[in-house]
Amino acid sequence: MRKLMIAFLALMLWPAGPALAWWDEGHMQIAYLAYKKLSPATRDRADALLKLNPDYPSWVAGAPAGQEKLYAFVHAATWPDDIKMKPDYYDDQVTDSTAKQLVPYGHLKHQYWHYKDALFSADDTPLPRPDAVDAVSQLKLMIAKLPANTDASEPLRSYSLSWSIHLVGDLHQPLHAIARYSSALPDKGGDRGGNEEQVIAANGETQNLHAYWDGIFGGYSTVFGAIFDADQRGGLSTVMPDAGKAQIIDPAVWAQESFDLAKTVAYAAPVRTDKQPVELTREYETNARDLARKQAALAAARLANLLEVVLR
């Protein structure tokens, strides 16, 4: 019943337009798993920074006693998506002078920070010059600001942490690391990471490929709901990431891995290179689900390892 209600709320409340990686449920589960791996000292340091986020009071409102830090950390994972719907936050463009600037809570949405569009041609369609500012370039800047011994102000460290928790999850969604070009989609942006291809899932819903992948874990959620789903039998808490891969904390490597997985799994048959809707096979959906779970678990482990290094 809870999953049905969440699905209904997601349908009613989620805005049309560009997909938001993993949606609330996926981002929250990743943050929850990462938080469980953090040392008490790192949890405290992260919470001290997150308290500077203007949304912190709403994050901890209603949290069970003693779980305020956990709830704040998990809520922070969706903050860069939440601001897209705030009336006092504004769009800017990747070509603007503001594109690369880290301005603490400066009321810009920076929607192009959510992905790294490595360009890929399916049929030798010419490729444009890639954007210089993306998820990888910005996450590297943010990571450099997180240690306490840098010249970054506390508000800047807080802003960087709020974004970093989210972007680690984004970069492990394969379609946030690629833009496929073809004769059917030759214009700037190509397929925009699967936003232009239409697929029909087993439930009969027609949606774009990117939204299908973003919604694998569900849509709208609460912190309680995400924790419940992660910890239930067969939930994300049971997926064990590769220990060696979990030690890799270079965003460029994560993006390259996701790019490769997009080509081999996300764009696998029966997905087309044009806008013609196609029915997904059971094999495709099973492979997508399995890969998404592995990527989310890996993202959680890497986020925890990253924060242990930069917040020690």
Predicted ranges, named:
Residues 6-14:
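Hydrophobic helical h-region of N-terminal Sec-dependent signal peptides
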Residues 1-4:
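Positively charged n-region of N-terminal signal peptides that target proteins for export
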